[in-house]
Amino acid sequence: MPPSPLSSGAFYQRWLGPVLANDEGLDAEQLSCTALTALGQASLRRQWPLVSTVLEGLAGDLQRRDLRLEQVLFGCRFPNPVGLAAGFDKNGVAAGLWDRFGFGFAEVGTVTWHGQPGNPRPRLFRLAQEQAALNRMGFNNDGAQALRRTLERQRLAPPGRRPAVLGINVGKSKVTALEQAPEDYASSLELLAPLADYAVINVSSPNTPGLRDLQDSSQLRRLVERLRRLPACPPLLVKIAPDLEDEAIDGIARLAFEEGLAGVIAVNTSLDRLGLEQRRLLQTGRTLAEEAGGLSGAPLRQRALEVIRRLRASAGPALTLIGVGGIDSAEIAWERITAGASLIQLYTGWIFQGPELVPRILEGLQLQLDRHGLRSIAEAVGSGLPWLPGSEDAEG
C-alpha cells in the first residue's frame, strides 16, 4: 500500500506549517474552505479504488486502536476519547472521513434551521504566536435541510454502526426571535435526529446576538423540555461558555441532571481576552480588546480546565463531560480527562499542529494507562491522577 500523502505529518508541516506559523499569508477561512472542499469530494468518492487506497493509508498513519481507549457513553460506543469539535465541518461535507483522521467522534455544525451567511469577512483570525484564534463567524451554514441532504449523499452507516460517532451541533437562526428559539431548535433537531448519534444544544456562541441568554436556567429548561417532546430525540448535550460565573455553572449542572441531559460540553470560545487585550491584529490594525468575537486555543486552556473541574464537583460522575479548549498535547488531554472529562475535542490546536496531533494524544494516553496500571481510560476520568513522564513519551 502506498504511503499516505500525510504520512508523519510531512505534507502538513512542509506546506501548511509555514503558512500557519504567522498571522499573515493565506486567509484562515479560505484555507479551511479549500481543505473542506477537497475532503468533501473525497467523502463522496471514498469507495472509489484510488480514493479508498489513499484513505486507508491515511488511517494507517493516524488511527490508534486500543480496547482500553473505548467507552460506551449515553448509548454510543466511542472507539477513543478524542473528537473533532464543532465549527470546522459546519455543513457536514466530510462526515464520512473523520474516523480516517484517527478521531473517535466528530461533531458537525453548528447548523441552524435557516441557512445564513454569517457575519461579514474578515471574521476568522490566526494568532500564531499564542497558538490561538479569534472568530466571529456567526453560525454561517447552509441550513438544516441542506445538512440532511449532504449527510444522506455520503451514504453513512446508520447511527450506532459507524466507525466514529457523529454528533450534530444545533444553534438558533439569527432571524429567529429569542422567544421563538425552542421551535427553531426543534425544527432542526426533528429533521436531523435520524442521522445523529447525539445532538448538542449550542447556547454559548458569542457571535449570535442574545444567544447566551439561553444559558439562563429558566430559558434553557424551556428549550430542553421542548426538544425532549420530539417524537425521536437523540441523546442531548448542552455546550456552555467559559465566561459563566461559578453559580451559573452549578445551575446548568443541576438542570442537566434534572432534565436527563446526556452531558455537558465545556467550553465554547471566550469573550474574555485572557491577557491578550493589547494584542493587535495585522489584518485590521485593531487590538483584541477592540475586536468582536470569541477567543479559542491555548489562552483558554486554564479556564476550560476550571469549568470541567467545577462541573465535576457539582454533578459528580453521573453527568458525562466533554472537554474542549486549548488541548494541544497528550499531557493537556490527560489533565482534562483526569479532571472529569470522559471525552475531549480538538479544533484550534489541531489546525496549528496538524493531523499528527490525534495519534500523539492517543499514544500519550496509552502510555499513561500503562504507567498508572489502569485497565481503561474510563478509570482515569475524574481520578486526579498526575501526568507521569517517561523517556519513551510520544511527545518527545
From Swiss-Prot:
Binds 1 FMN per subunit. Its cofactor is FMN. Pfam families: DHO_dh. It comes from the Bacteria. It is a peripheral membrane protein. Pathway: Pyrimidine metabolism; UMP biosynthesis via de novo pathway; orotate from (S)-dihydroorotate (quinone route): step 1/1. InterPro entries: Aldolase_TIM, DHO_dehydrogenase, Dihydroorotate_DH_2, Dihydroorotate_DH_cat, Dihydroorotate_DH_CS. Transmembrane segments: none annotated. It catalyses: (S)-dihydroorotate + a quinone = orotate + a quinol. FMN binds at A86, G87, F88, D89, K90, T110, N169, N202, K239, V267, G297, G326, Y347, T348. One of its GO terms (molecular function) is dihydroorotate dehydrogenase (quinone) activity. The active site is at S205. It is an enzyme of class 1 (oxidoreductase). It is found in: Cell membrane. Belongs to the dihydroorotate dehydrogenase family. Type 2 subfamily. PANTHER family: DIHYDROOROTATE DEHYDROGENASE (QUINONE), MITOCHONDRIAL (PTHR48109:SF4), DIHYDROOROTATE DEHYDROGENASE (QUINONE), MITOCHONDRIAL-RELATED (PTHR48109). Monomer. This is Dihydroorotate dehydrogenase (quinone). It comes from Parasynechococcus marenigrum (strain WH8102).
